[in-house]
């Protein structure tokens, strides 16, 4: 059974051009920016700090009510903004009327691109959930990225995102995020392979606690870079070094 799945992996997922994806292996990525010490995750301050430290940036992105791609992880504002509002039910202007503890407001993707300005690479995780129209989000991401020359990639747990970029923006580097625990959508072996075949990604971003495993080993052998998250300790940093190509890290997991 496993040999059949491996053959199907090779059939559905082509090896990416090393010239397109090689840069992914060369960086440590700050998970949601370089947060801590008063800097909030996914905030302008966290992104500025990551750039200053020469770290790549991983960020989260979801859609506002008026279809702006907003940089924010949680579906609601309670944890970080002290509001019970849902992000998808509020316009960009309503998002930006709220403030983090440091006084800054959430930003959209265009504002993040201005902060980064090509100085470090950017990993953009597109948020999704059941019955969510990811196509609308993907279109706005492409609009925001038009003309941006800095290294960047789009990724998601939802294989529809990578598949959409393959079809509609094939030069955008695209990845599939995966985990195997109870919080993931790919707990079973067959579900992981089905997601891989649907996504047809250029790279994987795999949960560090699931390493090592056969899928990651096969992907690296086939030329797909494998990033791993969230690396939050020296021990996990060593695991990432052994079994993946680059870490998405925070706190004590950063170099």
Residue ranges: model-predicted function:
Residues 1-255:
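Phosphate-group recognition and catalysis centered on beta-loop-alpha active-site segments
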């Amino acid at each position: 059974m496993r040999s059949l799945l491996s053959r199907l992996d090779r059939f559905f997922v082509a090896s990416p051009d090393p010239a397109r994806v090689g840069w992914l292996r060369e960086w440590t990525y700050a998970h949601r920016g370089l947060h801590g010490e008063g800097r909030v995750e996914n905030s302008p301050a966290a992104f500025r700090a990551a750039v200053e430290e020469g770290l790549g940036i991983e960020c989260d992105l979801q859609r506002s009510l008026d279809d702006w791609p907003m940089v924010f992880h949680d579906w609601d504002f309670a944890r970080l903004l002290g509001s019970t509002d849902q992000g998808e039910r509020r316009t960009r202007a309503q998002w930006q009327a709220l403030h983090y503890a440091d006084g800054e407001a959430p930003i959209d993707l265009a504002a993040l691109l201005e902060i980064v300005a090509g100085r470090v690479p950017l990993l953009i995780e597109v948020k999704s959930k059941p019955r969510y129209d990811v196509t609308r989000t993907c279109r706005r991401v492409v609009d925001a990225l038009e003309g941006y020359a800095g290294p960047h990639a789009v990724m998601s747990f939802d294989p529809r995102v990578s598949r959409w970029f393959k079809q509609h923006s094939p030069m955008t580097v695209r990845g599939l995020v995966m985990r195997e625990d109870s919080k993931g959508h790919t707990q079973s072996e067959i579900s992981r392979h089905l997601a891989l075949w649907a996504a047809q990604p250029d790279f994987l971003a795999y949960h560090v606690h699931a390493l090592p495993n056969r899928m990651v080993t096969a992907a690296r052998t086939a030329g797909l870079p494998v990033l791993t998250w969230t690396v939050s300790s020296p021990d996990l940093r060593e695991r990432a070094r052994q079994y993946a190509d680059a870490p998405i890290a925070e706190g004590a997991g950063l170099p």
